[in-house]
């Protein structure tokens, strides 16, 4: 179900938590979900990004495009079972060898998600679970709903699509109010930015390693 909340004027929660969750609002929003998921890593972190997903999921929704990460190597790990996916995520997070570990995982229990959060803290990295919905219990500190928005107007041709846009809803959080933000992909910098700031000169990026607002994509 799409959010009825207006776009928030509050700052976007840029810096990722050790463990987050995000789901697509509708099946057609899976590409937007993956774009958002891959963005939850700090700018300047050159460690690889790992994606663990069932083979059936990859066959249905496609494989992430590694060069779109803007320099970070992509490790794609097809799995068969939820247990296998959770094991891969936990080992990757605990190792500290990756900047981000994303798992298309359904049905993770509260205990399993707590193990992932603990592993992420141990490894100094970020984990993101991408279930079908947010109905279950989870240790994730932020839980998001992602939907696709009409693209921006192309600056050189109003008949052509411009930069991809997505709406992100913070549905649940520890210590933060729910909110909705519009983000936009910058294809030149491989970054997601707040869409309403792109017209400004020198807009801040979302999720920087130095703690300033910024978010890698």
Each model region followed by its residue ranges:
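N-terminal regions of ATP-driven nucleic-acid and macromolecular assemblies
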Residues: 1-100, 105-217
